[in-house]
A protein has these predicted regions:
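C-terminal extensions
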Residues: 1-2, 6-85
Length: 85
């Protein structure tokens, strides 16, 4: 997969995402959320790498709008999973 090195591939496999088809079904935001919940280290660069892999482009070629969209999706997942106080 484009943008996906050994470390990210290993992190994906740890959460059951074994190939590009699995990643496309899961989506980049949910995949990073799953990695985060599994104790992995996620960051915006990884999120964009995952989105680029889904679109089969280098993550540097994502538009600002595409980056903002997946970032917002990821932040919503984090917010929804935060304990209510």
């Amino acid at each position: 997969m484009i943008n996906i090195g050994e470390v990210i591939q290993w992190e994906l496999e740890q959460v059951g995402i074994m190939n590009l088809e699995d990643l496309k079904k899961t989506g980049s935001a949910r995949a990073l959320f799953m990695i985060h919940n599994n104790g992995g280290n996620g960051c915006l660069s990884m999120l964009y790498a995952l989105e680029g892999a889904i679109k089969e482009i280098r993550w540097h070629d994502l538009t600002r709008e595409e980056k903002d969209k997946v970032k917002n999706e990821y932040e919503e997942l984090l917010k929804d999973s935060a304990p209510n106080m």
